[in-house]
From Swiss-Prot:
This is Ferredoxin--NADP reductase 1. Its EC number is 1.18.1.2. Belongs to the ferredoxin--NADP reductase type 2 family. It comes from the Bacteria.
Amino acid sequence: MIKTDILIIGAGPTGLFAVFEAGLLKLKCHLIDALPQPGGQCSEIYPKKPIYDIPGFPEVLAGDLVDNLMEQIKPFEPGFTLGERAETIDKQEDGSFIVTTSQGAKHHAPVVVIAGGLGSFEPRKPPIPSIKEYENKGVAYIIRDPEVYRDKKVVIAGGGDSALDWSIFLADVASEVSLVHRRKDFRGALDSVEKVEELSKIGKINLITDAEVVDLKGENELDSVLIRHRDQARGEELKDTDHFIPLFGLSPKLGPIANWGLEIEKNAIKVDNAYDYQTNIPGIYAIGDVNTYKGKLKLILCGFHEAAIMCQSAYQRINPDKKYVMKYTTVSGVSGFDGSKKEAKKEVVKSIN
């Protein structure tokens, strides 16, 4: 049995930052995540993708953000149960909880925090009959390492931010990038759409609209895709490629958490945002993209804010007879459970007679 003060389900950026905020309050954390490494989608789906709206970072790669968070929480020695999914939760007589994972590991804590981002998720796959046989043989639904595509021919399908952004990024990596979208209009950010149009005009992206990839070809691995144009006069064309990457977004699922008796709204967990991001079950909180409330913004920076507020409430729940006096880290420094301490240099005061 793993015992901790706060059990966090989800080791994405929000869950990781919650470890830091809890550590400042001398609360120990343990994290459960179905993925084999911390970082959530930032590590699993877009580690090389730049993020522009993290305060203090004009630009930071998603993977680097995770690395920085891991370094930041290191003094607080969090525990991790990775590659296992939280399956069941049982409330104890004293109000604490036991959470059991898919591998049977039991975790006991007075506070449970669900920070699972979109929960469990899987990529939306296009209805191409032959697509399964080419998975990992030229077909991928997630770009983990852009270097795989260096000097290769790549066909990307999709009309959202991921398809646009990766087409732009790979234009400087791959030997040829083709972006196929079934409509003329894209659903992504305006500047990304304009950038794709600009790169298309100078021949760095082959933009194919009003068309779909309908079949895949190749002996032992992918070597071409069949593109069907909406304009019947253009018919179909067979395009040589080394890689086909359909980026149609993720299909989010809460998984077993949906059966825990929590109040769910549109595949998200309802919380009391006016106070502490607690759910309808006292002692269970939800922070980050997995929660919903009036005015909710699904941004990493908002998840950080929610983590800080949640930890204050968790402290009071765990220590009902204590009153925590908030101190700024610029004054108190950061004292880790490993004996380390970070603090500002003391000012030298000299009296003048």
